[in-house]
From Swiss-Prot:
Native organism taxonomy: Bacteria, Bacillati, Bacillota, Clostridia, Eubacteriales
Organism of derivation: Syntrophomonas wolfei subsp. wolfei (strain DSM 2245B / Goettingen)
One GO CC term on file: cytoplasm
SUPFAM superfamilies: C-terminal domain of arginine repressor (SSF55252), Winged helix' DNA-binding domain (SSF46785)
NCBIfam families: argR_whole
Superkingdom of this protein's organism: Bacteria
Gene name of the record: argR
Keywords: Amino-acid biosynthesis, Arginine biosynthesis, Cytoplasm, DNA-binding, Repressor, Transcription, Transcription regulation
InterPro entries membership: Arg_repress, Arg_repress_C, Arg_repress_C_sf, Arg_repress_DNA-bd, WH-like_DNA-bd_sf, WH_DNA-bd_sf
Protein known as: Arginine repressor
An MF annotation (GO) of this entry: DNA-binding transcription factor activity
Subcellular localization(s) per the UniProt record: Cytoplasm
Family: Belongs to the ArgR family.
Pathway annotation from the record: Amino-acid biosynthesis; L-arginine biosynthesis [regulation]
Role according to the record: Regulates arginine biosynthesis genes.
Keyword Transcription attached: yes
Length: 153
């Protein structure tokens, strides 16, 4: 959920000028996210969003530093293009990828630092992700399924 929410935040601030955390919170709620101002504040900090001046005051933007915007967009693109399917049992998630893609996808998962994914092991076309606690597995699978949906690029 966190990754999907943060990807949505990036989309929102790329599409319109958002001046306050409250405005961002309301926009996320309108898109189906159950968020609080504190959650949005943490996301802003993790995404390293900055406030830039505009004609009406200030609005949130991604920093020009490489890595922040690109890493989320890259992860979404790689997952859209490489992940074929996934399944889980207990605290283990199996992610099927195109041949040769598993290492790249596993590396992106590891770099995203999901607090509930404690590690990944990648073969040529299969990734094993270990989740803790096991109750988090269905939510992570749901996030991946959302990321697998092709966007309108």
């Amino acid at each position: 959920m966190k990754l999907r929410r943060q990807l949505c935040i990036i989309d929102i601030i790329n599409q319109k000028e958002v001046a306050t955390q409250e405005e961002l919170c309301e926009t996320l709620k309108n898109q189906g996210f159950d968020v609080t101002q504190a959650t949005v504040s943490r996301d802003i900090k993790e995404l390293k969003l900055i406030k830039v001046a505009d004609k009406d005051g200030y609005h949130y933007a991604l920093p020009d530093t490489p890595g922040v915007k690109g890493s989320f967009e890259r992860m979404k693109r790689v997952i859209e293009d490489s992940v074929l399917g996934l399944d889980y049992s207990e605290n283990l998630i199996i992610i099927k990828t195109l041949p040769g893609s598993a290492h790249a996808v596993a590396s992106l998962i590891d770099s995203a630092e999901w607090p509930t994914i404690i590690g990944t092991v990648a073969g040529d076309d299969t990734i094993l992700a270990v989740v803790k606690p096991k109750e988090a597995a269905p939510g992570i699978v749901e996030e991946f399924e959302q990321l697998m949906l092709k966007s309108n690029r």
